[in-house]
Amino acid sequence: MTEFESAPAYQEAKYLTSAAEFDQLPPDQGAEIAFIGRSNAGKSSALNIITGIKGLARTSKTPGRTQMINFFALNEHERLVDLPGYGYAKVPRMVQKRWEELVDSYLKNRRCLKGLVVVMDIRHPLKEMDEDVIEWAVNYDIPIHILLTKSDKLSQNAAKKTLGEVQTAISAYGEKLTLQLFSSHDRTGLDEVKAVLSQWFRSEP
């Protein structure tokens, strides 16, 4: 068995580097899975729970604060990537445009990118910018997995109802998009998302 055939040790994640510009990205080799979502949708909390490392990805009380791409190494060849959050109304238009250019360049040109996890608060799914990000990734032929986070905030029936509604809304994209319920609070869906990530890491280039 080679190093690429075994499941990644997510608990071994370590901060690698941050990039504010496309030319600051680490070498485009190995395999990466990126996480993206609206500010305060629970993206950083999801990364912390998946790796089991509290504080790995910084959570912020100020939406839109993080405007850099953060890389976390699982091993020499595999990385998790925390893309900057979006959708905060108080961010100046110039900052928003810079975010769009940086993220679009990353999604379009990053050859080692295996998949994109789109994080959405289950109480506010599929906002306009969520749909824009999905369109970008679909156009660049990037597999997408949606995490409907904070599922513990809804009753079980309400969460399942929202899951079904989002599934219907994205059905036109076909098998390129998958989704699940997730909660960093009670760990709902943790094994499921880890299985998706591991499958992506094991996929052929």
From Swiss-Prot:
The terms describing its cellular component in GO are: cytosol
> Can you give the residue ranges of the EngB-type G domain?
29-203
Q: Which domain of life is it from?
A: Bacteria
Give the Gene Ontology MF terms in alphabetical order: GTP binding; metal ion binding
Names of required cofactors? Mg(2+)
A GO BP annotation = division septum assembly
Protein's name in the database: Probable GTP-binding protein EngB
Gene name tied to this protein: engB
